[in-house]
Amino acid sequence: MPRRREVPKRDVLPDPKFGSVELTKFMNVLMIDGKKSVAERIVYGALEQIEKKTGKVAIEVFNEAIANAKPIVEVKSRRVGGANYQVPVEVRPSRRLALAMRWVRDAARKRGEKSMDLRLAGELIDASEGRGGALKKREEVHRMAEANKAFSHFRF
């Protein structure tokens, strides 16, 4: 273990439009090459599209989508006696949020709509309604954990 002191967690400021810390974190996940204004434009554009398409409050759809995409368990590799086992472990809350955001972003990037804000809006709507690429990824991770339940006694 390193002997350096523990690095403090940086607090993320809430976004100016909705006052949501999660939304700012999502913008940071979406950001490429430090271009935060581009990420903001995409996210706010997607939220406008969500309100247009669904008629619901956009931030609620966003929060619901992220909540639905959060994994509960995942598998980690553990080496025991020359064999690697996929050991199911519970996911920490901070990692849950990070994984959900990453999966929503990746699923949105893979979609076929014309612009990123339309893709993101579509993915967030799908995730809030219990379908879409991000939820597919979550189910896949849960299936892996379920399949390797027998190795859960090799806890970390």
Curated annotation (Swiss-Prot):
SUPFAM superfamilies: Ribosomal protein S7
Spans traversing the lipid bilayer: none
UniProt KW rRNA-binding keyword: yes
InterPro entries per the UniProt record, alphabetical: Ribosomal_uS7, Ribosomal_uS7_bac/org-type, Ribosomal_uS7_CS, Ribosomal_uS7_dom, Ribosomal_uS7_dom_sf
This protein's record includes keyword Phosphoprotein: no
GO molecular function: mRNA binding; rRNA binding; structural constituent of ribosome; tRNA binding
Alphabetized UniProt keyword annotations: Ribonucleoprotein, Ribosomal protein, RNA-binding, rRNA-binding, tRNA-binding
Oligomer status and interactors: Part of the 30S ribosomal subunit. Contacts proteins S9 and S11.
Family from the record: Belongs to the universal ribosomal protein uS7 family.
Name of this protein: Small ribosomal subunit protein uS7
Organism field: Neisseria meningitidis serogroup B (strain ATCC BAA-335 / MC58)
Species lineage: Bacteria, Pseudomonadati, Pseudomonadota, Betaproteobacteria, Neisseriales
Gene: rpsG
